[in-house]
Swiss-Prot record:
Record-level GO BP terms: glycerophospholipid catabolic process
Positions annotated with a glycan in the UniProt record: 142, 176, 195, 293, 466, 472, 482, 503, 524, 533, 552, 597
Gene3D superfamilies hit by this protein: Cytosolic phospholipase A2 catalytic domain
Ranges of residues in domain PLA2c: 50-597
Keywords per UniProt: Glycoprotein, Hydrolase, Lipid degradation, Lipid metabolism, Secreted, Signal
Broadest EC class assigned to this enzyme: hydrolase
Nuclease keyword on record: no
SMART domains, per the entry: PLAc (SM00022)
One GO molecular-function entry: phospholipase A2 activity
Species: Arthroderma benhamiae (strain ATCC MYA-4681 / CBS 112371)
Known catalytic reactions: a 1-acyl-sn-glycero-3-phosphocholine + H2O = sn-glycerol 3-phosphocholine + a fatty acid + H(+)
Family: Belongs to the lysophospholipase family.
Matches recorded under InterPro entries: Acyl_Trfase/lysoPLipase, LysoPLipase_cat_dom
Protein name: Lysophospholipase ARB_05919
Length: 643
């Protein structure tokens, strides 16, 4: 029997809405301790609380928050030691990098300020990004051996993600800085059990298969409590709850776990981990398309807001459910906490269902399915249920002369990659953060066969040139066109952009662009594929590890040295230190030199660099396999939402 949306909706409602709601479903992984902080006052439902003595308010984005400034003092000290450890293993011929770091340790502003950005792209981005972070993490077995890059993560000040990359960050941080190894190990007892899609629900680890109806009942129960408390709900609520069951190690998907609670984690407070940043886009009232001048929002443990001139302001993350007006809380309003549910924040950064609705005609689906989905999604769009709704709008009445959101009671937010900036550069190129180098992990599906072709990094460069002034003082290195990316192999191998800082007027970070490429498996799986067996999951993570290390430096024995040179480059400029000859050779090898080749290339179909991993029952090159998975997701989740 084949269900069309209306039939499936009736079926779902009939089977998932009994008179009483049953007990919760545990989701515990044997090797990942439950260490995050479930500090929401009333589970998933936001609730009023007493305000602190100084009431929260919108602040200008003219500088970093005082909290971030104080945190940076701790983190930069930790990264100095981590970089010294890194360079004790990664050598630069003719240059003592450790002595250089020690000699400038009295002024951390002289030292490298490193950031890592993990792109969107669903589970593909999560797994490929996980492989890179696993390679960069000195806690990973053998990652500090010759040819490896372990310690780069510990050397980073900032770590940004959006969509699938945001899921990766959320799963790591909400589970108290768990390693990728911890998240994936344990087979059937691992936290990352992607062999059961979020449509089915998690495996409870004892009976083998959890009851799917019970799983949906629990999600409906929590979301209904939020709605009963007077807050808007949308598809992002059910999406975020479903993601939480798979990514957060807590019973019922951790409904009380918040994004702001990361700031209360002891590892974060002591500066032992990078500063996590999630990115999402604002959708202007009355619009459906997300353009290059869309307002870009960031979620960090302390604040939510934007550096863009439209709003240029931030509010405390833990209080985003409060009824701010013109930047302050009225005297008769209490504070509200709990709106920043960790799953809802991760879901916000990946709320791409409205994007799917806009591209139905390009999908290889039966006409009856397209028509039914279009009607279904259109009915939701009329009520703005296809996006994440932040109501009350924390920026209501704020920046009235410039903000498209100042006059609306609800702030509509969507997937951070919908403006084509699928790599979350935006929070890292803000002048106030003084980032020197960004290691950009690009898992985008730009080409016909779902490999990157530079679209994301090009979009950020184009935004920096936007005549509307939306870039607001940010600077970005020159980037070539898509065809040049493919013709010159810039999407096939790591490439440095912005090597010569004299080519830009304002300080600009060096970009180390690391595109998804096939090493041991075809990792070009669909953004909309929701299910992977453990073998394929581990193969894609291993592939990402090889992408980041260039096959443990077997493709280029100097790759670790060149990574080190990229880290040091801007710092050497600031201290007027001569660039080592070894680094000059690296820059000659990896820097884009401005050459263009814009002729139309053949279909980009890269071959494996190494011996292919045996995927057993997993399919190879699943770049087109996710369409019906997303159809099922949309139909099922929206049916539930319309209760």
């Amino acid at each position: 029997m084949m269900f069309i949306p209306a039939t499936l909706g009736t079926f779902v409602l009939a089977s998932l809405l009994p008179a009483t709601v049953g007990a919760g479903i545990p989701n515990a992984a044997a090797d990942v301790a439950v260490r995050a902080l479930p500090n929401a006052p009333d589970g998933y439902a936001p609730a009023e609380v007493d305000c602190p003595s100084t009431k929260p308010a919108v602040r200008s984005a003219a500088k970093l928050s005082q909290q971030e400034q104080d945190w940076l003092k701790k983190r930069r000290m930790k990264t100095t030691g981590a970089m010294a450890d890194f360079f004790s293993r990664v050598k630069i011929e003719g240059f003592d990098a450790v002595a250089y770091l020690v000699g400038n340790a009295d002024n951390v502003a002289k030292l490298p300020n490193v950031a890592i950005a993990v792109s969107g792209g669903g589970y593909r981005a999560l797994m490929n990004g996980a492989g890179a972070l696993k390679a960069f993490d000195s806690r990973t077995d053998n990652s500090t051996e010759p040819g490896q890059l372990g310690g780069l993560l510990q050397s980073a000040t900032y770590l940004s993600g959006l969509s699938g990359g945001g899921w990766l960050l959320g799963s790591m941080y909400v589970n108290n800085d768990s390693t990728i190894t911890e998240l994936q190990k344990g087979g059937s007892n691992s936290l990352w059990k992607f062999n059961r899609s979020i449509l089915e629900g998690p495996d409870d680890g004892s009976s083998g298969v959890v009851d799917t109806a019970e799983y949906y009942k629990e999600m409906i129960k929590e979301i209904s409590r939020k709605k009963a408390a007077g807050f808007e709900t949308s598809i992002t609520d059910i999406w975020g709850r479903a993601l939480s069951y798979q990514l957060i190690n807590a019973p019922k998907g951790g409904p009380a776990y918040t994004w702001s609670s990361i700031s209360q984690n002891s590892k974060f407070q002591s500066g032992d981990v990078p500063f996590p940043l999630l990115v999402a886009d604002g959708r202007n009232p009355g619009e459906k398309l997300i353009g290059g001048n869309a307002t870009i929002f960031e979620f960090n443990p302390y604040e939510f807001g934007t550096w863009d001139p439209t709003i240029f302001g931030f509010v405390p993350t833990q209080y985003i459910g409060s009824k701010f007006e013109a930047g302050t809380l009225p005297s008769d309003e209490k504070c509200v906490r709990g709106m920043d549910n960790a799953g809802f924040i991760m879901g916000t950064s990946s709320s791409l269902f409205n994007q799917f609705a806009l591209h139905l005609d390009s999908q290889d689906l039966p006409k009856v399915v397209k028509d039914s989905l279009r009607d279904f999604l259109s009915s939701l769009d009329e009520a703005n249920n296809d996006i994440a709704e932040y109501k009350p709008n924390p920026f209501f009445g704020y920046a009235k002369s410039t903000s498209p959101f100042a006059g609306v009671k609800s702030l509509p937010v969507v997937d951070g990659g919908e403006d084509k900036q699928n790599i979350p550069f935006h929070p890292l190129i803000q002048p106030a953060r003084h980032v020197d180098v960004i290691f950009a992990i690009d898992s985008s599906a730009d080409t016909e066969l779902a490999w990157p072709n530079g679209d994301s990094i090009i979009a950020t460069y184009q935004r920096s040139l936007n005549s509307t002034g939306i870039a607001n003082g940010t600077s970005f290195p020159a980037i070539p066109d898509n065809n040049t990316f493919i013709n010159l192999g810039l999407n096939h191998n790591p490439t440095f952009f912005g090597c010569d800082s004299s080519n830009t007027t304002n300080p600009t970070p060096l970009i180390v662009y690391i595109p998804n490429s096939p090493y041991v498996t075809h990792s070009n799986v669909s953004t909309f594929n929701l299910k992977y067996n453990t073998t394929q999951r581990d193969a894609i993570i291993l592939n990402g590890y090889n992408v980041a290390t260039m096959a443990n430096a077997t493709r280029d024995g100097n790759w670790p040295t060149c990574v080190g040179c990229a880290m040091l480059s801007r710092s050497l400029e600031r201290t007027k230190t001569a660039v080592p000859d070894a680094c000059k050779q690296c820059f000659k090898m990896y820097c884009w030199d401005g050459t263009l080749n814009s002729t139309k290339p053949d279909v980009y179909d890269p071959k494996l660099f190494l011996t292919e991993v045996d995927l057993q029952s997993a399919a190879k090159g699943l770049h087109a396999s996710g369409k019906l998975s997303l159809v099922a997701a949309v139909v099922t989740l929206l049916s539930i939402l319309l209760v």
